[in-house]
């Protein structure tokens, strides 16, 4: 992913301004680490089928990272999770205040779509990428999931409701990453759907694993506050730690089976990523 890190560093959002902190606020969380999970999924699909398009696809990968970073900045705010640590660093609002953190998140959100619109891809592809990101990140996707999560804090949900919450809040943007890669390389609609559905299940596993890590890791190990999910509708809160681990095992085994049915180029491109993440809850 070194190529993506270089691309990111070369395309950090900036404005010509006399504001003393604005550009630092835009850039700090982007360069402050992170797994780059969503860009890696998208670029993995492109690398598998159309390696010559990888450079052009960097714009879409960056758009995903910008959008994801905006969501983290807002998620950390006092009105939401009220977190003071992210990726081992103080959260944006603790450094620059709530107002600038909100505005920085807003700027990264909108800049993601500017990056997509200006990418060196065909116009029909750009339009479809914008649609996928907006649909999965917005009204009926990530934003909806966050709204459900906040509204039902301290009010227990049923398992199917918790799944629906996290399908929206976490899984849809991960699924969108795979679908966007499929669109860039021109895969048929059936293959796009298979990758999207795989991404939904992968996103749910990712969330269960995060819930497990919240219950078992220290803030220093996780790089963010832990042990704060007791009032939230997490999988550990609902199923208990061992129940959540068993649920994660089931998802991981299902994903392994699905992954084996993909074409060889996809398996080869994403095998390392799957190996790193499918069973990380067992570490």
Task: Walk through the language-model features, giving the residues of each.
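N-terminal amphipathic/basic leader segments beginning at the initiator methionine
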Residues: 1-13
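Mg2+-dependent prenyl diphosphate-binding active-site environment of isoprenoid biosynthetic enzymes
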Residues: 12, 16-278
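Charged C-terminal helix
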Residues: 280-283
């Amino acid at each position: 992913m070194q190529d993506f890190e270089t691309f990111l560093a070369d395309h950090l959002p900036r404005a010509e301004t006399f504001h003393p902190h604005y550009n630092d606020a835009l850039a700090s969380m982007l360069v402050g680490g992170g797994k780059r999970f969503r860009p890696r999924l998208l670029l993995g699909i492109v690398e598998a089928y159309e390696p010559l398009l990888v450079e052009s696809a960097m714009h879409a990968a960056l758009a995903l990272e910008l959008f994801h970073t905006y969501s983290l900045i807002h998620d950390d705010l006092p009105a939401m999770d009220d977190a003071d640590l992210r990726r081992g660093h103080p959260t944006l609002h603790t450094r620059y205040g709530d107002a600038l953190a909100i505005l920085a998140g807003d700027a990264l959100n909108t800049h993601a779509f500017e990056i997509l619109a200006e990418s060196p891809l065909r116009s029909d592809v750009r339009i479809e990428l914008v649609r996928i990101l907006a649909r999965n990140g917005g009204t009926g996707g990530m934003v909806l999931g966050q709204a459900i999560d906040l509204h039902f804090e301290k009010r227990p949900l049923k398992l199917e409701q918790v799944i629906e919450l996290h399908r929206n809040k976490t899984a849809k943007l991960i699924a969108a990453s795979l679908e966007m890669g499929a669109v860039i390389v021109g895969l048929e609609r059936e293959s796009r759907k298979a990758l999207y559905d795989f991404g939904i299940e992968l996103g749910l596993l990712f969330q269960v694993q995060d819930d497990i890590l919240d219950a078992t890791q220290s803030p220093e190990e996780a790089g963010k506050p832990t042990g704060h999910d007791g009032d939230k509708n997490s999988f550990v809160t609902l199923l208990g730690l061992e129940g959540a681990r068993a649920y994660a095992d089931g998802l991981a085994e299902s994903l392994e089976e699905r992954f084996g049915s993909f074409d060889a180029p996809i398996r080869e491109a994403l095998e390392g990523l799957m190996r790193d993440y499918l069973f990380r809850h067992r570490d």
